[in-house]
From Swiss-Prot:
It is found in: Golgi apparatus membrane; Cytoplasm, Cytoskeleton, Spindle; Nucleus; Cytoplasm, Cytoskeleton, Microtubule organizing center, Centrosome. A lipid is attached at residue 2 (N-myristoyl glycine). Keywords: Cell cycle, Cell division, Cell projection, Cytoplasm, Cytoskeleton, Golgi apparatus, GTP-binding, Lipoprotein, Magnesium, Membrane, Metal-binding, Myristate, Nucleotide-binding, Nucleus, Phosphoprotein, Protein transport, Transport. The modification Phosphoserine is found at residue 5. Small GTP-binding protein which cycles between an inactive GDP-bound and an active GTP-bound form, and the rate of cycling is regulated by guanine nucleotide exchange factors (GEF) and GTPase-activating proteins (GAP). Required for normal cytokinesis and cilia signaling. Requires assistance from GTPase-activating proteins (GAPs) like RP2 and PDE6D, in order to cycle between inactive GDP-bound and active GTP-bound forms. Required for targeting proteins to the cilium, including myristoylated NPHP3 and prenylated INPP5E. This is ADP-ribosylation factor-like protein 3. It comes from Sus scrofa (Pig). The keyword Transport applies. Its main location: Golgi.
Length: 182
């Protein structure tokens, strides 16, 4: 087999599909993050009623991202989307300190879910462009992330608005797609 035929075969190989669940409290920036990933306009975003799905190509993967609304009345329905999740991305509004306890509680409950057991989790400490944003290290400490032992995890500072840190987080996602512990 010549080099050209090997290259053709590699080029025609289908991307590995990855199911990503994008969760977090309302107003954390999930939809802005999703639109930033898809290189879409982020100037007119309204609260998500239900869910959005987008497919994004990245590093040989087809990332199917499910963005589920974070309003309190929608959260009980999150579990309907757990099945076959490869990566969980949890978005936190780093500037909304009064909701850290609530967001920490929701994240802890997600990490206890059987259908999400061992699923790698990326926590985006979003809105780092705001002066009042808590650093990712402070959030990690406050949420006791260091106690997570049953899966690979990462906390990533980002600003969905400016795009800063988003690609770093997605690089981690692509590196850890197959890290789901059995």
């Amino acid at each position: 087999m010549g080099l050209l035929s090997i290259l053709r075969k590699l080029k025609s190989a289908p991307d590995q599909e990855v199911r990503i669940l994008l969760l977090g409290l309302d107003n954390a920036g999930k939809t802005t993050l999703l639109k930033q990933l898809a290189s879409e306009d982020i100037s007119h975003i309204t609260p998500t009623q239900g869910f959005n799905i987008k497919s994004v190509q990245s590093q040989g993967f087809k990332l199917n991202v499910w963005d589920i609304g974070g309003q309190r009345k929608i959260r009980p329905y999150w579990r309907n989307y757990f099945e076959n999740t490869d990566i969980l991305i949890y978005v936190i509004d780093s500037a909304d300190r009064k909701r850290f306890e609530e967001t920490g509680q929701e994240l802890a409950e997600l990490l206890e879910e059987e259908k999400l057991s061992c699923v790698p989790v990326l926590i985006f400490a979003n809105k780092q462009d705001l002066l009042t944003a808590a650093p990712a290290s402070e959030i990690a400490e406050g949420l006791n992330l260091h106690t997570i032992r049953d899966r690979v995890w990462q906390i990533q500072s980002c600003s969905a608005l400016t795009g800063e840190g988003v690609q770093d987080g997605m690089n981690w996602v692509c590196k850890n797609v197959n890290a789901k512990k059995k």
